[in-house]
């Protein structure tokens, strides 16, 4: 009887873990509803920039664990620039990817960051970022980091870094610069655990502006 009871308890302990493992093992395409009102701004291409990934003409298929959902909708956003030049920080998580004024927030020139508080730690699947809708906007020193520490002093994981000369002070990045588009940038969350997502930039190859249209954080709650 004791052996049977022990086996039953062991089974009950293992089952939730198995369910979670099965859920994470099955991968499905990430669902993103892209803006249908995207405008391609007629900016001239910047000069003297390193090789970069050109703007895609169609959305990428990115696989994530089954059960992944949008975690960042309506979540609070803070920034190294508490008083943006244009717009308000809540535009970053309002679910609106449309281009143009009234849809983006613009920070001061120079190195800046925005930070999303998910409310609690979660297992991250993907982070999607839209600065602007333009094939000739190539943002500089883009770094995406995750932590459970709101001050990012400990337990920090870097998921993306294209700061090739380490000028941002966050380490030398190996990711490529990329051109903006209505399909944004999808960063692999790698199953990292974290509550806070911080995104850095240092203007773009054309000007000093730091604009953010939308950020989506997808994961397993």
Where are these regions (language model features)?
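Trp- and acidic/polar-enriched beta-sheet ligand-binding modules for extracellular glycan
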Residues: 22-42, 80, 106-112, 134-221
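Predominantly extracellular/luminal regions of secreted and cell-surface proteins
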Residues: 60-96
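Bacterial N-terminal signal peptides
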Residues: 7-13
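A short beta-strand element within beta-rich, extracytoplasmic domains
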Residues: 77, 123-134, 199
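C-terminal motif of bacterial Sec signal peptides marking the signal peptidase cleavage site
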Residues: 15-17
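Positively charged n-region of N-terminal signal peptides that target proteins for export
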Residues: 1-4
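N-terminal pre-domain segments of enzymes
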Residues: 21-68
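Extended extracellular/luminal ectodomain segments enriched in beta-structured repeat modules
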Residues: 111, 119-126, 194-195
């Amino acid at each position: 009887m004791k052996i049977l009871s022990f086996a039953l308890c062991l089974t009950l302990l293992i089952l939730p873990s198995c369910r979670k493992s099965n859920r994470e093992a099955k991968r499905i395409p990430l669902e993103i509803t892209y803006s249908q009102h995207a405008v391609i701004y007629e900016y001239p291409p910047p000069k003297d920039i390193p090789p970069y990934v050109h703007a895609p003409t169609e959305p990428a298929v990115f696989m994530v664990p089954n059960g992944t959902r949008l975690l960042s909708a309506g979540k609070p956003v803070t920034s190294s620039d508490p008083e943006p030049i244009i717009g308000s920080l809540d535009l970053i998580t309002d679910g609106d990817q449309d281009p143009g004024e009234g849809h983006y927030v613009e920070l001061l020139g120079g190195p800046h960051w925005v930070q999303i508080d998910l409310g609690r730690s979660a297992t991250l699947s993907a982070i999607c970022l839209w600065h602007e809708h333009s094939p000739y906007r190539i943002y500089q020193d883009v770094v995406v980091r995750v932590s459970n520490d709101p001050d990012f002093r400990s337990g920090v994981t870097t998921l993306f870094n294209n700061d090739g000369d380490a000028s941002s002070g966050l380490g030398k990045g190996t990711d490529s610069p990329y051109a903006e588009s209505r399909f944004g940038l999808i960063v692999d969350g790698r199953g990292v655990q974290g509550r806070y997502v911080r995104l850095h930039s240092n203007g773009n190859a054309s000007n000093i502006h730091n604009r953010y249209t939308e950020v989506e954080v997808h994961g397993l709650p």
